[in-house]
């Protein structure tokens, strides 16, 4: 029975066609998560060659970031669509680590002016209480919201309904 269960469990495992992973530490080396992400990025890039996208905050705006290699060609049509239709300002390129996976850096600052509406929506839909938040809650929340919006914009523009997609926020 154990072999049968294992067979069916493995048989039903799905491999995603695309992976999106977001973290404050994508192209932004500030702590331990950076090491975890950058170490496994090479392995994931080998398996999913340019079908894994890391999403990070564009905290280096206007400054040279040695961890980010910007590209004008990667996802250029979607980048234009994201700005014009979804009001998302992104920079796209490669993470300067082994494997050089595709990176989307998003400017999350514009969402601060919509913060109260976003928090209201989160409370009404999911009962996420932001009233008692402290520390860097707002900054982390606005980045998380922006990263989710990136995937929400990218998916229908670039992928198909039959594509299996995983979104892993950190």
What does each model-found stretch correspond to?
Residues 6-170:
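Catalytic cores of nucleotide-sugar-dependent glycosyltransferases that transfer UDP/GDP/TDP-activated
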